[in-house]
Amino acid sequence: MNNSDIKALIAKIILFSLIGVAFWLLTPNAGLITYAILVLGAIIWLIYETAQKKNRHLIKHGILMGIFLMIFDFIVENIGFFAGLWTSPQSLYSVISVPIEIMALTLIGGTAWAIHLPQKFDKAYVIFESLIFGFFGALGEYLLILNSMMVYTNGWTSVHAFFGYIITWLILFWVWYKVIRKNS
């Protein structure tokens, strides 16, 4: 990992911490503003990444990753919903069980995430990044639960979510480096 990779990891920790503090400060009455904060954060991140000249050649690849993440998340969220593990009861509009705001977040945030990744696969980076997303993903879901935006059922817990996010991010890294970026 080089210095810019370390800075990117630190920037994500800071961004996700700020979002977490905003959720916590608004608890228990945050409601739909939680989704607005997440989507706005993803939009700002995407604007930042695409504004950098060095990243412009990655935009099409990034969009493919965003689409992949949106579809992957849609499938996983619906499987969990129909298995009775969780539900997201509040949304402007849901597609089956997935809030449209989460679909926007995964598309936009997934695109920004892919664009910022190191040029070459880096095992240490993958491990740290997966742990960051595991921790903040589980924490984010916990805060959504506190704000009545999500409900766990039938024994699903934040620990399950933590490992689910880690597995998801390992899959995303594999798709990015072995499929989408393989020939570029």
Enumerate the predicted regions with their spans.
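Aromatic-rich, lipid-facing transmembrane alpha helices and their immediate juxtamembrane interface loops
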Residues: 1-184
